[in-house]
Every structure is written in C-alpha cells, then in structure tokens.
Curated annotation (Swiss-Prot):
It comes from Borreliella burgdorferi (strain ATCC 35210 / DSM 4680 / CIP 102532 / B31) (Borrelia burgdorferi). Disulfide bonds: none annotated. GO terms for biological process: translation. The keyword Ribosomal protein applies. HAMAP family: Ribosomal_uS2_B. GO terms for cellular component: cytosolic small ribosomal subunit. CDD domains: RPS2. InterPro entries: Ribosomal_uS2 (IPR001865), Ribosomal_uS2_bac/mit/plastid (IPR005706), Ribosomal_uS2_CS (IPR018130), Ribosomal_uS2_flav_dom_sf (IPR023591). GO terms for molecular function: structural constituent of ribosome. Keywords: Ribonucleoprotein, Ribosomal protein. Belongs to the universal ribosomal protein uS2 family. This is Small ribosomal subunit protein uS2. SUPFAM superfamilies: Ribosomal protein S2. Pfam families: Ribosomal_S2.
Amino acid sequence: MAIITMKSLLEAGVHFGHQVKRLDPRMKRFIFSERNEIHILDLQKTLQGIKDSYELVQRVIKDGKKVLFVGTKKQASEIIEQEARRSDMPYVNNRWLGGMLSNFNTIRKSVQKLKKLEKMEVDGTFDMISKKEISQLNREKSKLAKNLTGIKDMETLPGAIFIIDPKREQIAINEARKLKIPIISVVDTNCNPDVIDCPIPGNDDAIRSVALFTKIISDAILESDKEVGIQIIENLNEEDLMKEIEIKNDKSDSIEERGE
C-alpha cells in the first residue's frame, strides 16, 4: 500500500513553486501562500491530485492498458526510466518525436526497424557484412534507440500518459488531447492546469519532488490488483508542518535546480 504524508511532500520540496513573477494565472486556485517572492503550493490540493491520479492509473491498468511515462528534462530523465521500468511501462525520457501518438503507425515502423537491427547484431548477420556496413548500421541503431527504446514494447496507444513538466512536453500533451488520452501531470506554478485531466500541483524541478511523484504513479500500477490502494495520512496541519521544515535550505535547493 502506498502511504503519503503531508510531511513527506514538504521534505521533498513539493510545495515550492516558481518566483511570483512567473505565475500562470490559471494556477491561482492551487496557491497556498507566498514566501520570499516564491509561491507556495497548497498541499491539500496536491494530495487530492495524487489521489485522483492514483485512482485513474489503477482503472487504466485494470482495463488492460498501459501508462506512458514522459519526462525529458535533465531532472526527470533518469527517474522516468527507472520507475517506468520498475512498473514495466513504456517511457519517453530523451526527446518526444512528433507523431509518437498522433502518427503511431509510422512510429511503430521505426520501432520495427530498431528491433530488426538489434536482432541482426545477435543472430550472426553482422559476421557476414563489412566493418563499414556494421558501423553504418550501428549508427542507425543508436540513433533509433536513443528515442525509441522506451516504447519498443508499446504495441498500442496508451490508456493514459503521465508527464513531468507540461510546459516542456507541450507536443505530447497536444497529441494526447487530440486522441482523448487522459493526461496526468505535475503542474508547477508556471503551468496551465486546464489542459491536464488529472493535475497534481507540485514542484516539477526539484529531483526529490519529481522522484516522489513518479514513484507514486509507478506504485499505483504495481498495486492495481489490490483492494486497498493509496493511504493519505495528515497528522499535522500544513502550516505547522511548514514550520518544522527549514524553508531557507529547501528553497535554495529548489531555486538552484530551476536556475532562478
């Protein structure tokens, strides 16, 4: 069972938004307060977003579909791959190729090409061709693998898509919306939550925050066959908990990762 506490969110720096001047007005309903020119997100609404997303993911998995993990920014790339692999789900963590969803059949042809090249490497085919040809094929394989490895086994369109940083992954969002694929995303204070089906208000830059959210989605997948899902524990109110956290230290970490 996944157990989420308000304190775990605070310790991961989930509550830190961007500088006040970078606010997307559509995020106002998710703002708790302002500290030192930094917006603080309402963690009660973060918890609700987690709960809604957890339930959506479990419905998708029970329907026999997959959740596509997407996060190509530096802070998210490794985490996205790790958690997607842990839950045996497809992922995109290098670059979103236009048409990955909206032109799925063409993308699948590229995937088949990648699989063919990988097969040639191990079935003895490379032993029968020149070193120059091997070099050319290896370059082609590496180029394809860089962007397609995570979706090699995604034979059909996903039942949902989980995104870190919707501003960066706008093309993925546009394609998912066009195909009516539900979108789950961490939405920071500079994001538009209105294009997301299940927005989770949170810090999408701090590594600990990204890791926490991605793990929650992965846990939801792994626990989809259990009757008891997520448990949210709030043993202290948000204001009291914030006093226990060294805001100055968390803030400096968060700002450094954002480059602000």
